[in-house]
Curated annotation (Swiss-Prot):
Gene transcribed to yield this protein: cobS
Protein name per its UniProtKB record: Adenosylcobinamide-GDP ribazoletransferase
Keyword Transmembrane helix: yes
Gene Ontology molecular function: adenosylcobinamide-GDP ribazoletransferase activity; cobalamin 5'-phosphate synthase activity
PANTHER family associated with the record: ADENOSYLCOBINAMIDE-GDP RIBAZOLETRANSFERASE
Reaction(s) this enzyme catalyzes, per UniProt: alpha-ribazole + adenosylcob(III)inamide-GDP = adenosylcob(III)alamin + GMP + H(+); alpha-ribazole 5'-phosphate + adenosylcob(III)inamide-GDP = adenosylcob(III)alamin 5'-phosphate + GMP + H(+)
Annotated transmembrane regions: 40-60, 64-84, 117-137, 142-162, 188-208, 210-230
Length: 260
């Protein structure tokens, strides 16, 4: 693998996963497929996560209440990503909660309107993540708490690669199908790099126990959700990819907060 190719893939992944602007020249000749970009998702998540991390650090330096600082940082993160993953979580919750069959669930997930299940999922996602991040703030230094954001961002986007590669497209004509499916090499690279990036950011400030807890819980959450979606939808969609990220982020933040 060439470093230049990986750098280009990372920039393209950042552009796909967020609203951060990237140089247009990087997209010359690019066909828009994402199957190779998946390998760069964790590092792209790391870069995206630094924006809310800096926000959190600034707020804590002003002695902002931990819960308020956590909520603002998560709001900034949603602005940076365009709430891409939150949208997937809401649509998946609506589809699974409101659909009595696989076909009906997929139809509901395609509807852009948010339903009761989606609204509840979004509220719980923000509430649980904010509470967990506030707990991390209270039991660690401001810098350590800030570093947890890009660490979890990298780890949760590595989980997307697992979900995407292990499940076929639920709809042959869907957006996820048109983007291609990652091969095992790209998936393995994403998982290993996600774990290494998380270790670099979590181990020094928090220690070994929170790191192990975060890695284990993220892995179990991603695996369990993938099995659940296989049974419910028999394949992945763009929405379930976003939901995977959200579920793993929630689970990892809770694991870190509990292990401190």
């Amino acid at each position: 693998m060439k470093i230049k190719d990986y750098a280009v893939d990372t920039a393209r992944a950042v552009a796909f996963l967020s609203r951060l602007p990237m140089p247009p020249a990087l997209f010359n000749g690019y066909d828009g497929r994402l199957n190779r970009l998946v390998r760069a998702f964790p590092f792209a998540g790391l870069l995206i996560g630094f924006v809310p991390a800096v926000t959190l650090l600034l707020l804590l330096s002003l002695r902002t209440d931990p819960l308020v600082a956590a909520l603002v940082a998560l709001s900034v993160q949603a602005l940076v990503t365009g709430a891409l993953h939150e949208d997937g979580l809401a649509d998946t919750a609506d589809g699974i909660g409101g659909g009595s069959s696989r076909e009906q669930s997929l139809i509901i997930m395609k509807d852009s309107r948010i339903g009761t299940y989606g609204a509840i999922a979004l509220i719980l996602s923000f509430a649980i993540r904010a509470a967990a991040l506030a707990a991390i703030i209270r039991h660690s230094s401001p810098l350590a708490a800030a570093l947890a954001i890009p660490a979890v961002a990298a780890l949760s986007r590595g989980a997307i690669a697992w979900h995407w590669q292990r499940l076929p497209p639920a709809k042959p004509d869907g957006v996820a199908a048109s983007n291609g499916q990652p091969n095992e090499a790209a998936m393995h690279f994403a998982l290993v790099s996600a774990g290494l990036l998380a270790a670099l950011l979590i181990w020094p400030p928090f220690g070994l126990r929170p790191l192990v807890a975060g890695l284990l819980v993220a892995g179990v959450a991603g695996f369990a959700f993938t099995v659940f979606i296989r049974r419910k939808l028999a394949g992945h969609t763009g929405d379930t990819l976003g939901a995977t990220q959200q579920i793993c982020e929630i689970a990892t933040l809770c694991a870190l907060a509990t292990a401190l």
